[in-house]
Design a protein with these regions (language model features):
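ATP/NTP phosphate-donor binding region
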Residues: 1-92, 99, 134-137, 318-323
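Catalytic core of DAGKc-family lipid kinases
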Residues: 37, 60, 68, 106-113, ...
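Conserved Motif II region of HX4D acyltransferases
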Residues: 96-97, 173, 291
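Active-site beta-loop-alpha substructure in enzyme catalytic cores
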Residues: 216-250
């Protein structure tokens, strides 16, 4: 059945389409009833996404409800979708929304399918290997299987943010917009972002402790989930990459690696696997959490989550774009 609009109306007014289908569903999990949350205002979604998704769902023998997220109703709509207990919950929205839904679902919730509807789409690209949400949706419907996704949690005492790809803490977080601009071929914009990042590169250093060890200092700390790390095993923990620069020339070299190529090979970077970390600074800490810029307070706690949520991903899983 297909429904669009407000949640209550979606659940009540759907129509069974099991006799009008033409494509086979995945044999790996049962998908009898699914829900899709859509934010039509997100940059990668568009005003026609709900009707386009309904057209795709109509090709399969399942019951589907499509809910358009509304300002001020986000928390209620997400909780209603989770409480409905669907076999899978699809999310076509921005990066932050996808993370929030996956985090709230947790390992006991329904299978989560975060489709690429944001700007950077780090989590969807890691799971589906594409930035085309329609292709990712069909992959999930036709080849989907359950996969436990590990991640981390960052808390500054005021906000608590989950991440499933990477968290960049410190001045090099300012390079994330430049890197994305380069990927999109917007070199003028990348240069502008790069100049801003260099101006702020020495505004403060971090003090941090990994797994309760003695404090150290660094320019930045990057925490990478096992889903995309090329350096650690799946259940070993988070990869902690410590970035240090001694002078402006080193900072520029590290910035170039961050924008253009493999930063891990830079001599200013050291890595290890961890379960938890504490990070401090004299001022608020610029950060990027799964592609979204966040300004955190001056004391941060980070912890590894072995099973953060259960994802609906292609079988065999798409190889994530590792870092």
């Amino acid at each position: 059945m297909i429904g669009t609009g407000r949640f209550a109306r979606d659940i009540a007014a759907t129509v069974d389409i099991r006799t009008a289908v033409s494509r086979a569903l995945t044999p790996h999990v049962a998908l009898g009833r699914v829900i899709m949350l859509v934010n039509p205002l997100s940059g990668g979604v568009g005003p026609n996404a709900a009707s386009e998704a309904a057209g795709i769902f109509a090709d399969y023998a399942l019951e589907a409800a499509i809910i358009a997220l509304e300002g001020g109703q986000f928390d209620v709509q997400v909780q209603q979708a989770l409480d409905a207990g669907p076999d899978a919950l699809f999310v076509l929205a921005g990066d932050g929304t996808a993370r929030a839904v996956a985090s709230r679902a947790g390992p006991a919730g329904p299978l989560i399918a975060p489709l690429p509807g944001g700007t950077m789409n780090m989590l969807p690209r890691a799971l589906y290997g594409t930035s085309d949400w329609k292709s990712a949706l069909r992959q999930a419907l036709e080849e989907g299987a359950e996969q436990s996704v590990a991640g981390g949690e960052v808390s500054d005492g005021r906000i608590r943010e989950s991440f499933f790809c990477a968290a960049i803490l410190g001045a090099p977080a300012l390079w994330a917009p430049a890197r994305e601009a380069v990927r999109e071929g917007k070199f003028g914009l990348a240069w502008a972002y790069g100049r801003r990042a260099l101006r702020r590169a020495f505004s403060g250093r971090l003090r941090f402790s990994l797994d309760g060890r003695a404090d150290r200092r660094a320019e930045a700390l990057v925490l990478i989930s096992p889903m995309i790390s090329k350096a650690i095993d799946e259940h070993a923990g988070l990869e902690a990459a410590v970035m240090n620069t001694a002078d402006a020339l080193q900072a520029f070299r590290l910035a170039a690696h961050a924008v253009f190529d493999g930063w891990r090979q830079d001599p200013a970077v050291t890595t290890r696997s961890i379960q938890q970390a504490t990070v401090r600074a004299r001022s608020r800490i610029p950060s990027v959490i799964d592609g979204e810029p966040v300004l955190l307070r001056h004391v941060i706690k980070v912890r590894f989550i072995r099973t953060a949520f259960r994802a609906l991903v292609p079988n065999p899983p798409t190889r994530a774009e590792g870092v």
